[in-house]
């Protein structure tokens, strides 16, 4: 008889252990859901507080025009580029936002990590069109509406070097993941900034890559010339930036 009682106790203990495990798991799941819901509400609040974006988005420089069909947004690399582009722009219709620090790779990151990133939420706020989210738990975020886009052109403007290309790629990846319609509708542009400035006599040429540099130099043949490699957008003077990168009449 005692063996039977012992085995009953074993079963009861095991059942109690199982019940405790289940309770623990339920609690863990509940806490995770509460955390996710809180995160979602915080993010939603962050993104929806976009009416007065000038005061809410750090270092964003708006333009004067309210006519969306002519407004251009330049997304530039860092504070030094912000200074150069601010001087070179036409403030009537060109606005600027610098991206500061390291940009998250949005193709690899989870949504909660993406939306907790200030650089990304600032860009979403300034763009104004919301996001296209393919996640059930995030589907009631600020829904995408292209008619709410505040810009006719969104122009990514980074240095002409390897770091610049990487930053450009990460910004494009963000737009592709969160608002691919902007790319499909032809709203996203790349501003080409020159890699070299070549001067000979009273003339100036700009080369955007090595091949163009060689082509220009082969035309100069025996003439004296000076050649200067771009150190980055922040080093370019305002006239050059306007001529090569920002003025719609002369930029690429």
Predicted feature descriptions by range:
Residues 57, 64, 170, 181, ...:
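Charged C-terminal transducer/switch regions of large nucleotide-driven machines
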Residues 1-11:
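Single conserved hydrophobic/aromatic residue that forms the stacking wall/gate
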Residues 31-51, 103-106:
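Amphipathic alpha-helical
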Residues 10, 39-43, 57, 88-93, ...:
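Short secondary-structure boundary/capping segments
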Residues 75-77, 151-162:
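Acidic beta-strand-to-loop metal/phosphate-binding motif
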Residues 15-39:
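Long, highly charged low-complexity segments enriched in Glu/Asp and Lys/Arg with interspersed Ser/Thr
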Residues 12-20, 69-146, 166-172, 180, ...:
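Metal-dependent catalytic core segments for phosphate chemistry
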Residues 46-73:
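Flexible, glycine/threonine-enriched loop-and-boundary segments that flank and lead into catalytic domains
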């Amino acid at each position: 008889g005692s063996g039977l009682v012992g085995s009953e106790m074993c079963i009861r203990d095991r059942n109690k252990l199982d019940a405790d495990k289940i309770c623990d798991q339920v609690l863990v799941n509940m806490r995770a859901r509460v955390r996710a819901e809180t995160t979602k509400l915080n993010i939603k609040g962050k993104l929806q507080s976009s009416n007065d974006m000038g005061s809410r988005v750090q270092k964003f420089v708006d333009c004067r025009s309210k006519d969306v069909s002519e407004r251009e947004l330049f997304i530039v690399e860092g504070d030094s580029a912000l200074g150069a582009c601010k001087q070179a722009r036409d403030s009537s219709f060109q606005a600027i936002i610098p991206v500061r620090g390291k940009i998250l790779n949005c193709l690899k990151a989870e949504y909660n990590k993406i939306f907790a990133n200030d650089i990304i939420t600032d860009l979403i706020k300034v763009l104004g069109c919301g996001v296209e989210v393919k996640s059930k738990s995030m589907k009631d975020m600020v829904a995408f509406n292209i008619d709410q886009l505040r810009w006719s052109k969104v122009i990514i403007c980074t240095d002409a070097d390897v770091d610049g290309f990487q930053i450009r790629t990460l910004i494009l990846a963000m737009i592709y993941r969160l608002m691919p319609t902007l790319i499909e509708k032809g709203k996203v542009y790349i501003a080409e900034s020159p890699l070299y400035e070549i001067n000979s006599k009273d003339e100036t040429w700009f080369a955007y890559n090595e091949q163009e540099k060689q082509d220009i130099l082969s035309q100069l043949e025996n003439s004296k010339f000076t050649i200067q490699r771009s150190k980055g957008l922040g080093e370019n003077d305002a006239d050059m930036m306007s001529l090569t990168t920002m003025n719609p009449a002369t930029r690429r």
